[in-house]
């Protein structure tokens, strides 16, 4: 969408027919339109490229701004005809430039919206250096199916604003019970949802499918993407030589979310980890997701044979979306070999079933950051194409970097080494000099400024949160007392101790 959004189009959305319907060649059913949501007039205010996003519960009008603009900021103000606004009691014409002076992020600036000389809305204008998103729905948001919504996005990275339709649903398993929910978004070309719409947001991939991660049990609001960044920095996979644009991890961008006119807090807007992200071959690639703990997940045994289903003993078939028994053959054969083969069979066959270099990197990764929930569950296992071995990548990395904020991790020792039966057998049988390969690879990774690079990325993320004022808003919204500087210090200290311990562990055991 053009970043200079057309005001007349916005007026049509807001002040159009009383009972609008949207007709397409594929559907004659009445569809919801933007004005069904009945946007408060404040959402039509634009400053430069960005929409003002309304939090009507707290009477806040959020506006994104780049850090390079906050000194002596002059903004071009736009709003529809038949309205008027004042900023600090100064009357502002539409399309007028207004001198805000030096912007203090998070500090309220009084703004009033008038119609027929009557004040209809009285807000505090809040500038933030984070990208901002507003999602408004007609219906309650469910786990499934996606419900119709309209969405406004202020994208700081691209200096663009977007207005579009989207389907939204609650995401996750256990996390669905948290008060702060995660969501899946699918951008739609129109209100019917028949055709999707791709956008390249925040310098990330061009796609229609996005994940809003609430990061609720991670009190640093940083660990998930920090872990993904770390994995991406050194992960190997056999197919990367053929697919230079493949990403072995999600990438994400910190945003502030307003959901149905109420501030919802700090989120990470993430790419999906799927066939497209990994650049697996259409038609011959395979992608499995591990969703729950089982003997099969840990390569310990097989309780049942896979059937014509998308699910098998803790695994979910994500691609292809075809419930066929033969799609389970590669992962079944791997579990069967690891769990039941004698040593000779294991030595002779394991390297034809898995990408051992990738497996080495994955084991080093989950132990470097102590990913306590990713040694079996919370993995993706993929095949690039027929004839290629399986490889591993991670997702859902909130229980990492010393996160003890759950009943599952509160008592976990910081010296725990994560493994499963696959890694145990690789080590015990020393497959093709596995131990020396692990040691050599770790020396390469650790000596390449691993600690300082992670700390640098963590500082970037925490500083963005603190500078924006979102730290206070997040605490107020969810009745928390998070000290983000304390979280920064904790993770930094924890990581230094963990990496030193793990380095000694490798030296002594490999």
Where are the language model's segments positioned?
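Sec-dependent signal peptide recognition
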Residues: 2-10
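Beta-rich interaction/scaffold domains
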Residues: 18-130
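C-terminal motif of bacterial Sec signal peptides marking the signal peptidase cleavage site
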Residues: 14-16
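A short glycine-rich, hydrophobically flanked beta-strand micro-motif that places a catalytic Asp/Glu
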Residues: 146, 250-256, 375-382
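Short, flexible loop/turn elements at secondary-structure junctions
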Residues: 137-139, 155-157, 170-172, 187-189, ...
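Middle-to-C-terminal accessory/interaction subdomains
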Residues: 164-166, 174, 178-179, 322-376, ...
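Conserved NTP-binding catalytic cores of kinases and kinase-like/nucleotidyltransferase enzymes
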Residues: 62-79, 87-89, 115-226
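Internal "kinase-insert"/substrate-recognition segments embedded within catalytic cores
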Residues: 186-194, 198-217, 221, 233-238, ...
């Amino acid at each position: 969408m053009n970043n200079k959004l057309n005001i007349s189009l916005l007026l049509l959305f807001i002040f159009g027919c009383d009972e609008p319907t949207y007709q397409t060649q594929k559907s004659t059913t009445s569809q919801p339109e933007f004005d069904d949501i009945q946007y408060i007039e404040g959402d039509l205010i634009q400053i430069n490229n960005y929409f003002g996003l309304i939090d009507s519960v707290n009477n806040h009008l959020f506006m994104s701004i780049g850090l390079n603009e906050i000194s002596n900021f002059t903004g071009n103000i736009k709003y529809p005809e038949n309205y008027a606004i004042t900023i600090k009691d100064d009357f502002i014409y539409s399309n007028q430039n207004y001198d805000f002076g030096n912007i203090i992020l998070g500090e309220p600036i009084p703004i009033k919206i008038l119609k027929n000389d009557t004040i209809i809305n009285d807000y505090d204008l809040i500038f933030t250096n984070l990208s901002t998103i507003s999602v408004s729905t007609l219906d309650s948001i469910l786990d499934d199916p996606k419900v119709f919504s309209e969405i406004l996005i202020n994208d700081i990275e691209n200096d663009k604003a977007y207005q579009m339709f989207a389907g939204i649903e609650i995401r996750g398993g256990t996390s669905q019970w948290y008060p702060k929910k995660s969501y899946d978004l699918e951008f739609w070309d129109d209100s019917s949802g028949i055709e999707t719409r791709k956008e390249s947001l925040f310098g990330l991939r061009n796609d229609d499918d996005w994940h809003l991660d609430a990061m609720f049990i991670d009190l640093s609001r940083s660990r998930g993407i920090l872990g993904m960044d770390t994995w991406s920095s050194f992960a190997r996979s056999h197919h990367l030589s053929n697919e230079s644009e493949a990403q072995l991890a999600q990438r994400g961008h910190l945003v502030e979310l307003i959901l149905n006119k109420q501030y919802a807090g700090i989120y990470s807007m993430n790419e999906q980890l799927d066939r497209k992200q990994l650049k697996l071959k259409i038609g011959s690639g395979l992608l499995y997701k591990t969703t729950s703990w089982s003997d099969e997940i840990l390569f310990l045994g097989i309780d049942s044979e896979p059937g014509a289903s998308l699910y098998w003993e803790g695994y979910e078939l994500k691609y292809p979306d075809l419930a066929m028994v033969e799609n389970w053959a590669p992962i079944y054969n791997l579990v069967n070999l690891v769990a039941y083969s004698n040593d000779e069979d294991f030595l002779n066959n394991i390297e034809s079933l898995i990408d051992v270099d990738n497996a080495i990197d994955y084991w080093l990764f989950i132990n470097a950051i102590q990913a306590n929930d990713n040694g079996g569950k919370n993995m993706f296992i993929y095949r690039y194409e027929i004839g290629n071995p399986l490889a591993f990548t991670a997702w859902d990395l909130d229980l990492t970097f010393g996160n003890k904020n759950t009943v599952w991790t509160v008592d976990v020792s910081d010296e725990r080494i994560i493994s499963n039966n696959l890694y145990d057998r690789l080590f015990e049988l020393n497959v093709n000099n596995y131990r020396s390969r692990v040691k050599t690879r770790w020396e390469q990774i650790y000596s390449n400024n691993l600690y300082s690079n992670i700390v640098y990325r963590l500082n970037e993320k925490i500083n963005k949160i603190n500078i924006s004022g979102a730290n206070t808003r997040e605490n107020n919204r969810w009745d928390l007392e998070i000290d983000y500087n304390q979280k920064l210090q904790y993770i930094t200290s924890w990581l230094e101790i963990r990496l030193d311990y793990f380095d000694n562990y490798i030296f002594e055991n490999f």
